[in-house]
Design a protein with these regions (language model features):
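Residues that form generic nucleotide/phosphate-binding pockets
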Residues: 21-24, 63, 67, 142, ...
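The canonical Cys-X-X-Cys-His
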Residues: 13, 17, 72-75, 122
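Internal, Lys/Arg-enriched amphipathic helical interaction segments that engage polyanionic partners
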Residues: 1-34
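A detector for short metal-coordination/catalytic motifs
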Residues: 88-93, 97-165
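Short, charged surface segments at domain edges that flank catalytic/cofactor-binding sites
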Residues: 26, 30-88, 100-110
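Generic hydrophobic, helix-prone segments enriched in Leu/Val/Ile
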Residues: 3, 35-39, 62-67, 132-142
Length: 165
């Protein structure tokens, strides 16, 4: 449906903006990155000219990348490159459960448990590739218990439906 496609397109644009913002921040690779035990409330809805969207937290995204040691969570042997600003391997944050579906959950999904670290190739594969279903399935099973610890309950079928898979 056209409305859903429009929402997902805007969701992807917001995620791209997050990626750009993170690229401009100097990251401390020696910091200890970890999950929080706190259940976070839903983020605030921000209105723009066209609709309302949920704000992404860049600190949470950076922490999620750090938890993964700035490597691709599909395969940590995937090639990355060093960022100009700080020499940290470049990976991209991806909300496994897209933020466009935040309304379906009682707590925030803009959390480290829902943000995976991906090499550019795998990130684009999830959005545009033939193997997106495989990648989403792999990540789902790796995150399912982490989701449940944050009172986020979602089936693989439901998650795949968010990606039209």
């Amino acid at each position: 449906d056209k409305t859903r496609a429009k929402i997902m397109k805007q969701n992807d644009q917001l995620d791209d903006m997050l990626k750009t913002v993170i690229t401009d921040i100097i990251i401390n690779p020696s910091k200890i990155y970890s999950y929080s035990d706190v259940l976070k409330p839903k983020p605030k809805l921000v209105e723009n000219k066209f609709n309302k969207v949920y704000k992404r937290n860049k600190a949470v995204a950076i922490n999620a990348l750090g938890i993964a040691n700035f490597s691709c969570e599909i395969d940590n042997k995937h090639k990355t490159f060093k960022r100009k600003k700080d020499g940290v391997p470049y990976t991209e944050p991806h909300h496994l459960i897209p933020m466009a579906f935040q309304d379906e959950f009682d707590f925030s999904i803009d959390i480290e448990e829902n943000i995976v670290s991906l090499c550019s190739n795998c990130h684009n594969e999830i959005h545009y590739g033939e193997n997106a279903r495989e990648l989403i399935t792999k990540l789902y099973y790796e995150r399912k218990i982490l989701f449940e610890k944050k009172n986020i309950y979602i089936s693989l079928i439901k998650l795949r439906s968010y990606y039209d898979l």
